[in-house]
Amino acid sequence: MDPSDFPSPFDPLTLPEKPLAGDLPVDMEFGEDLLESQTAPSRGWAPPGPSPSSGALDLLDTPSGLEKDPGGVLDGATELLGLGGLLYKAPSPPEVDHGPEGTLAWDSGEQTLEPGPGCQTPEVMPPDPGAGASPPSPEGLLEPLAPDSPIILESPHIEEEIPPLATRRRGSPGQEEEHTQGQPQSPNAPPSPSVGETLGDGINSSQSKPGVCTPTAHPSLPGDGLTGKEIEKPPERVQKRSERVRRAEPPKPEVVDSTESIPVSDEDSDAMVDDPNDEDFVPFRPRRSPRMSLRSSMAQRAGRSSMGTKMSCAHCRTPLQKGQTAYQRKGLPQLFCSSSCLTTYSKKPLGRKTCTFCKKEIWNTKDSVVVQTGPGGSFHEFCTSVCLSLYEAQQQRPIPQSGDPADATRCSICQKTGEVLHEVSNGSVVHRLCSDSCFSKFRANKGLKTNCCDQCGAYIYARPGGLGPELLFHDGQQKRFCNTTCLGAYKKKNTRVYPCVWCKTLCKNFEMLSHVDRNGKTSLFCSLCCTTSYKVKQAGLTGPPRPCSFCRRSLSDPCYYNKVDRTVYQFCSPSCWTKFQHTSPEGGIHLSCHYCHSLFSGKPEVLEWQDQVFQFCCRDCCEDFKRLRGVVSQCEHCRQEKLLHEKLRFSGVEKSFCSEGCVLLYKQDFTKKLGLCCITCTYCSQTCQRGVTEQLDGSTWDFCSEDCKTKYLLWYCKAARCHACKRQGKLLETIHWRGQIRHFCNQQCLLRFYSQQNQPNLDTQSGPESLLNSQSSESKPQTPSQTKVENNHTVRTPDENGNLGKTPVKRATPSVPTPPPPPPPATPRKNKAAMCKPLMQNRGVSCKAEMKSKGSQTEEWKPQVIVLPIPVPIFVPVPMHLYCQKVPVPFSMPIPVPVPMFLPTTLESTEKIVETIEELKVKIPSNPLEADILAMAEMIAEAEELDKASSDLCDLVSNQSAEGLLEDCDLFGTARDDVLAMAVKMANVLDEPGQDLEADFPKNPLDINPSVDFLFDCGLVGPEDVSTEQDLPRAMRKGQKRLMLSESCSRDSLSSQPSCTGLNYSYGVNAWKCWVQSKYANGETSKGDELRFGPKPMRIKEDILACSAAELNYGLAQFVREITRPNGERYEPDSIYYLCLGIQQYLLENNRMVNIFTDLYYLTFVQELNKSLSTWQPTLLPNNTVFSRVEEEHLWECKQLGVYSPFVLLNTLMFFNTKFFGLQTAEEHMQLSFTNVVRQSRKCTTPRGTTKVVSIRYYAPVRQRKGRDTGPGKRKREDETILEQRENRMNPLRCPVKFYEFYLSKCPESLRTRNDVFYLQPERSCIAESPLWYSVIPMDRSMLESMLNRILAVREIYEELGRPGEEDLD
């Protein structure tokens, strides 16, 4: 039948909102007036009408009764009689007694109906208070009864005749469709629906067309007249929201957004989700569709008319006897014989039919199809016609032939033969499972992690939009659910009520916060306020009770605590605790932690999750928040779902990791995949392929793109702007914010940026949400006198969240009936997020995740223990005989053990070593005793010779008459070093305050101070020594090679012998003391003259060893500027350099290991000395020699030449390059490179034979040699100058070739092929054992000039340049 054939009132879209059968008024309790009404009008109870005294029903005089309301409902029996136009005699009403307990007692009786002309089968109508009988008093109707109150039934059997064309709406919610005629009713159906239909009001009666009479027979209630109280209209029925929801259409599963939280009251929450533990819990049953086929309705009415209405217990099916006490649950029409049957029936599981083909539960019964099909011809029910077609096609499909058909359909778990529900392919084997339980067992046995729902067991398919399943952490495990319905069902099933540990408030476990203490005990709290108070209490930080820190009231019990910046605050209530969180106690910029809600002013720990940014005060709060909110993601390396540890970007894609180990392993694999082109971007820190490379200030940076390079250079050049204050300059703070790099001036700007991002100003918005933002969430409810009653009889009162809501109230109306007002419109909510904000803090934390401890158990975190045996001496007492017998005593005896020694040597020295060993074998006899005697004799002889030589030298020095003999003595032998040492010691004795360096060592040798005449008498110092040649490598021409090589061996013996005096440090120390004494001779110096180190003045000490590094730095700088001779004249720059070298040697000999010429602490002194030496020019003596008081030997003595440090090695290389290559300017030194300075070795012939000579050659650039080569072609090639340094074989410690090789070994290997750099800057953090001493940054010009000025003050530099054959270099 087409739905359009039905009249419009039966259209489900146009049905009015009416109460259904089984719903009682809110003031009527269980069991009272049960059989009075199955349905009630939405406007309340029908008003009483006139009561005829004869008890008969009169006809309507006017056709006004034909007017119907839009819902098609006829109120009162007078309107029904007006439709038929006939008069029927009403039967005598049964006697109704109101017992003392409010039960209804009535007698049974046969009700006869006489059909009139033109009428169909008569229908039994419900009683009407206005149809000639007095209605019961409102007090009797509204008298409350206890739940499950008994009902005394006196006549349980009533027969009913139903017209076949009447269409009825079943009143009980969730009641299934009636079976056809001839089928018994199901146990879940009401046992006697005719009772409600017989004794209800006339609302459910069908509409009648004009000309069709609907005779009714209805018993009237007792009462002959109406009192004033009875005439009054009963109070308007107030419907709860829970009743409205249960009477609504079958609900569809809603998808609840977990990010939004709508404030609901306790009543609303009970209406939305029913608790099976509640007494009024009604299992969900789909309501029968109001549009039934005509055939099914006729069959139902025919079946009802043929069978009696004898009532029985809905559980045990026991017939109810007359006068027996019946039990009924509120809102349900079923009757029970005892309380046990009522309780057992309420706990029965919900029975639903399943589809034969797809095995799913049939929810919508109107679309179901019942057919007789299959091989056995039995009846099967399908959810849709599609399943029926698929089932028939499956039955017609030929069955494949197999060897054993039983094995093909046998379950792999329970080994039962039947239908296969699941097929699992594990490897190459296909497992068939018959049920969900077997599927769960299979997953447990195989250890499979299938994405199945933990509530219903169904497989969770991928949701649209890439959304994953619903997740919930409960009891330390992660639960998965296919939808929000299963999630709600799981919560309802596992909900428990526990008291808060702090405030003892009862709360549900899914709404509480858990805290695990040090002992592993878990405590539950109702809010963060109680959690924080408990932590402060456990830490022992609570002091004596004080007034509330917010409202200054006295504290209640329990009081609440909070700790902010090492200060504990006390509060009287959670509201004061919450309000205090939004205020800054110190007035600065403070952020609120998203976990503990405490204020902090440091750099926050940031977490980005689901397009939101969360801030935390510390790392611990961030980790707890991740476990609490279930911040779980799939690790990119191990592919397991764990807590999120870190998010990193690889080639522009953000990837999640569960631990630092997974980050390192994934980065290692990623680097191997990309190879050498894999870099980490200097700006955005992502690992990707190299895009752009930039070099600046000696540093090389790699970037992923040109954009990152531009932004980084702006930040590096201090041209970027702060994202908070928009200022341009040096930005110290850098963060990653939503995939972008943000820079800030300092931490204050960073905090201001965070506070602006997460705390919008809601007070500037218009609407009621601004008021909600300013009002407190703990405002007291208004008194009834302050509430405003509106026209729709609702009162606006603040709910538990501080929001104004509508609460229905009872209103006593006068006796004159007034039409009810229309339903009020829905209240618009302008700012839904602002109204939900107070609830987001409490409902957002459903349960605390405790998977950290459980997750870490899968990893091998315990280190591997290795047993290491350690010998421990143990004293074992040995019994002795008290010295009466011989006792063994340990005795040590040395045993020679041959130990092989490997001596590093070369091929040249191997033969000499073998010869020396042979000589020792010949020299040392085979008898060890004889060898010891010979060795002792040699030692005694050598000692006697040394004593004799020293005594002769002392006599020679003390003898004044041996002056002529001293002049002829060869003091250039081995004894000269001893004489030099003696001279230095003697010079130290001359510690007089009036020492004058330039007077003792004048430019003219004839003006020598008599106090040091003995030095010249001993031959230590002489004018002829100034021009003494040393055999050291120097530049030469090609034509002079053979001459130089032939003479090299003869001069090798003289190359290591110095021709100068030793450095006398007493001049420098005495000059320092005299300068300090003269500086402070006249008391304190003026403020302009005194030295200052920062804001404090500095006083120089006379003892140079007692001065600190800063005092020595500034003191030496002023010493260089102010030092003068005793006669007041200014010292020459070379003399000042000599004095400073003496101070350096004095510091070293007194174990003060500093270098005042190279250390960075003495930069001020070095700059001042450089200014003095830069203007100095050497003095040419009358004998055409250059005079300088600084000699090469002085530099060796005070460790300015050698390999003591990287700077000293550089100074040594520059000294040799200046001395032998003739490079006297910084430009010439900067032209040196690793490619034009080459080490070469060649063989040459000497009078002693053929020898191998190793040297360093410098091939100067072409532009340097262009001006020097002026002759014709052949002559030009012959006179071409070769700059060369040859090795010093007699003294390898001063060999330039060895220094050059050592310098190459300490330089980076990548720079050894460079043609633009030679001198490199030392590494700041290198030590002597470091493999590299120098960086890739070349020395700057200023440092080279400072070192070169000190080298050019040495006398030997000019002596080497003035040798024959060097004139072509100028």
UniProtKB/Swiss-Prot annotation:
Expression tissues: Ubiquitously expressed in all embryonic stages and adult tissues.
Species of origin: Mus musculus
UniProt modified residues of type Phosphoserine: S265, S269
Location of the protein in the cell: Nucleus
Disordered: annotated segments: 1-73, 85-310, 761-831
Basic and acidic residues: compositionally biased ranges: 227-255, 790-799
Biased composition annotated in UniProt, kind: Pro residues: 816-827
Biased composition (Polar residues): 761-789
SMART domains documented for this protein: TRASH (SM00746)
Cross-referenced PANTHER family: ZINC FINGER MYM-TYPE PROTEIN, ZINC FINGER MYM-TYPE PROTEIN 3
Protein name: Zinc finger MYM-type protein 3
Low complexity bias spans: 1-12, 40-56, 130-146
GO cellular component annotations of the record: nucleoplasm; nucleus
